[in-house]
A protein has these predicted regions:
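Short structural boundary motif marking the start of a folded domain
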Residues: 8-10
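Compact, glycine-rich, soluble single-domain proteins
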Residues: 2-4, 14-94, 105-106
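Helix-rich terminal scaffold detector
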Residues: 93-94, 99-113
Length: 113
């Protein structure tokens, strides 16, 4: 068994950063569904802006809002306005074809790569 990329949201923009929240990344529910993420799932977040990487967990954001909010300590590492990739992984014994979600500058789903 190996950890393989299952899906990612590619080049999303962080719309908010809230250091006072208890932790996590808030993601628009539409993007959560299209990526196949589960609320509470561990994800890897990479900043294309700074190169920072961190692991956190997904929480539900308002559908069609475009919300991508870094919460808690993660908001010190990845800030509002940064371009990020959010990746989910799966433990599997055979190759899988990952879903790569494309979004526009308002984090609206535009298609799969």
């Amino acid at each position: 068994m190996r950890w393989l990329l299952r899906s990612k949201i590619f080049k999303a923009l962080v719309t908010e950063a809230d250091v006072n929240y208890k932790g996590s990344i808030t993601i628009d529910d539409e993007l959560i569904d299209k990526a196949g993420f589960l609320v509470g799932e561990k994800v890897l977040v990479v900043s294309n802006t700074t190169g920072a990487r961190l692991e956190t967990y997904v929480i539900s954001g308002k559908r069609h809002s475009g919300t991508i909010c870094m919460n808690g300590a993660a908001a010190h590492v990845i800030k509002k306005g940064e371009e990020i990739i959010v990746m989910g992984f799966e433990l599997a014994d055979t190759s899988i074809e990952p879903k790569i979600l494309l979004v526009d500058k308002q984090n609206r789903f535009t298609g799969y790569l």
